[in-house]
Amino acid sequence: MAIFNRDADNLIDFIRPDVTSKYEATNIAKVNTKGFELNTDYRFKLNEFNQTLSFGYNYLNDDILDQNKDLSRYSLNTLKHQFITRFESKLFKNVRQNIIYKHAERTIGTSYNVWDASVIVAVNKFNFTVTANNIFNADYIESGYVPMPPSSLLFGLRYNL
């Protein structure tokens, strides 16, 4: 568990007055951020293989003392709540999987839910990976005002020396 309090004066951010203008670095505001973070893991065995179920929660409360009416790229578009859960499992001697669920809510009230998953198969010195990101094709913004990509499928190969 972590508890924190951050005071920032003359916070530098990239802002713009409207969506057609370019971002400019500017000292924009005095911001006080308070919050806490909780993380826990539950470990167990299934068919003699280790499994892990992880939970994490973050809460942020930004007290924007000098209101910024322009579009801020980072600081004023912060998260208020973030919940992440991960299930890491080993199905067979050489097969592992990860399933991740993330829920986030911004200070302005918008929220999103994202599911990711991956499977790793180890064969001798090789690891073959298949990763699915944003499985249900959620529309969301991670940071700033840049939309995140839709669903994607990635394939990987790693050789271990």
Residue ranges and their predicted role:
Residues 1, 38, 87, 99, ...:
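Hydrophobic, well-ordered secondary-structure elements that form the walls
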Residues 3, 11-20, 64-72, 100-101, ...:
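Outer-membrane beta-barrel translocator domains and adjoining extracellular loop/strand segments
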Residues 4-8, 27-104:
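Gram-negative outer-membrane beta-barrel transporters
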Residues 17-24, 42:
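Generic detector of contiguous secondary-structure segments
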Residues 23, 33, 78-84, 112-116, ...:
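Transmembrane beta-barrel architecture of outer membranes
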Residues 25-26, 145:
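Conserved short-loop catalytic and cofactor-binding motifs
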Residues 26-27, 134:
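Asparagine-centered polar/low-complexity signal
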Residues 116-161:
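C-terminal beta-signal and adjacent terminal beta-strands/loops
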